[in-house]
Amino acid sequence: MSFSTLMDKRERGSFDSQFLIAMPGLDDGNFARSVIYICAHSDAGAMGFIINRPQQITFTDILLHLKLVDSNDAIMLPNRTREFPIQCGGPVESGRGFVLHSDDYLSESSIPVSDDISLTATLDIVRAISNGRGPQKATMMLGYAGWGPGQLENEIANNGWLNCPAAEELIFDRGLDNKYERALALMGVDARMLSTDAGHA
């Protein structure tokens, strides 16, 4: 199921604006110890973004690739722009960029995900960020995680994931190393005590 189809068909599914937290038994290399923010969930499937996987490419690299700046301009970019976070959002459409952001920035192409968070996947927000006119809180994801009809529900029922309400501060926090433990802590779970047989919230 494509990103556009899932977003077009989205309803207020039971896992909208939830975190999925990988159980220890989930050994898929794409998702082991991952925390995923679910943006859309309906009968058509689900999609979301891994929020604790670093990406080697930098925002400056992206600006150069898109020819929004040249090499001379890139040197002059302010630190806030050069250090803008890029993450691996998931294995689907991994060459495509998506920006999760606070709702103080909205364009015609922005899609509300929750009361406070929107998603924009067009060049206008990249330009705005590069010019210092972007949202106060934002992170760029390359790719996303997607599930077909009923697939996510089955994975949760089979103890592949824990789920809990998402916390905005964790989505936009640039410290990725301990997000897994912090997401579990939202549920009162100590990662050291978690077994592959635990249930879900």
From Swiss-Prot:
Any one annotated GO CC term: cytosol
Xref: Pfam families: DUF179
Family statement drawn from the similarity comment of this UniProt entry: Belongs to the UPF0301 (AlgH) family.
Protein name (database record): UPF0301 protein Atu0781
